[in-house]
From Swiss-Prot:
The gene is ctpB. Disruption phenotype: Leads to fluffy and albino colonies, and reduced conidia formation, when all 6 genes ctpA to ctpF are deleted. It is found in: Mitochondrion inner membrane. It is a multi-pass membrane protein. The keyword RNA-binding does not apply. It comes from Aspergillus niger (strain ATCC 1015 / CBS 113.46 / FGSC A1144 / LSHB Ac4 / NCTC 3858a / NRRL 328 / USDA 3528.7). Its EC number is 7.-.-.-. Solcar repeats lie at residues 10-97, 105-193, 201-283. One of its GO terms (biological process) is mitochondrial citrate transmembrane transport. It catalyses: citrate(in) + H(+)(in) = citrate(out) + H(+)(out). Belongs to the mitochondrial carrier (TC 2.A.29) family. This is Mitochondrial citrate transporter B. GO terms for molecular function: citrate secondary active transmembrane transporter activity. Keywords: Membrane, Mitochondrion, Mitochondrion inner membrane, Repeat, Translocase, Transmembrane, Transmembrane helix, Transport.
Length: 291
């Protein structure tokens, strides 16, 4: 099987396009898991709420229709396309400046590159789109006041001002920085390890590395995701208030609420996003005549 990447350092335009395509494909493919995770995190304690992601997805599809599983999907696809493009171009730019003459990156430097990339994508793309997506899913639990992503944006801005789209900026930036650091850092460690053992980066090995990075990311960063979601509900909450509410409602275990839902998504998305990114990078470099 042909390898997906060479030792060539990706050019910025390649990272931007490949990252955007990878993010869009990943978001569209795994959205039902994201919907289930967000819905569970927004609900107060309820014995009637399924905690198994597949069961919740089936229940929602049966009671509300399959379309309900894609509530807020367009917003997430747009946001994920943008954030993945920003993440990969930021990460690759920093990685290129920190890597040695052989193009290798130490684990510590890989984590630093991930933190910076995560913070950058949070400010430029993630916070506004996550705010809208979370508000749409939260709104769908009751009588709807939002007709679409655009309508939700208009209502939120008209009612609370433009700054409302950045509600939860601190919690989102913490979550994105941690997620990107762990995800990109873990993938970099695995990639360097495979390279050291002369294992070629095929589609299969790349998917496995990405999937494993996704699993590590879920349990290492879930508290940040839970706090971010609570802060970005329709009513909104400050960082400290969100933490207190979660602790009061569920105890310490509540900070990992929705982890099984997120695991299903990141297991797939980790494999998908890195596989698509590496493949797109390879194809774009081939078209540009870069060896």
């Amino acid at each position: 099987m042909a390898t997906l990447a060479s030792s060539t350092k990706p050019q910025k335009w390649v990272s931007l396009i490949a990252g955007g395509v990878a993010g869009g494909v990943e978001a569209a493919s795994t959205y039902p898991f994201e919907y289930a995770k967000t819905r569970v995190q927004l609900l107060r304690t309820s014995k009637s709420t399924p905690s198994n992601p597949l069961r919740l997805i089936f229940t929602v599809a049966q009671q509300e229709g399959v379309g309900a599983l894609y509530t807020g999907c367009s917003t997430l696809i747009i946001g994920t396309t943008a954030k993945a493009a920003v993440r990969f171009v930021s990460y690759d730019t920093i990685k290129n400046s920190l890597s040695d003459e052989r193009g290798s990156l130490s684990p510590a430097r890989g984590i630093v590159a991930g933190v910076v990339a995560g913070a950058t994508e949070s400010v430029l793309a993630v916070t506004p789109t996550e705010r809208i997506k979370t508000a749409l899913i939260d709104d769908a639990k009751n009588a709807r006041q939002f007709r679409s992503s655009l309508h939700a944006t208009q209502v939120l801005v008209r009612t609370h001002g433009l700054r409302e789209l950045y509600r939860g900026l601190v919690s989102t930036t913490l979550k994105q920085s941690a997620t990107s650091a762990v995800r990109m850092g873990t993938y970099n460690i695995l990639k360097e390890s495979f390279k050291a053992h002369d294992i070629p980066p095929t589609l299969f090995t790349t998917f496995c590395m990405g999937a494993l990075a996704g699993v590590v990311t879920v349990y290492a960063t879930q508290p940040f995701d839970t706090i971010k979601t609570r802060a970005q509900g329709v009513q909104g909450a400050g960082l400290v208030e969100a933490i207190r509410n979660i602790q009061s409602d569920y105890g310490v275990r509540g900070f990992w609420k929705g982890s099984s839902m997120r695991l299903g998504r990141l297991l797939l998305s980790g494999g998908i996003v890195f596989s698509v990114y590496e493949k797109m990078t390879y194809l774009l470099h081939s078209r540009a005549g870069v060896e």
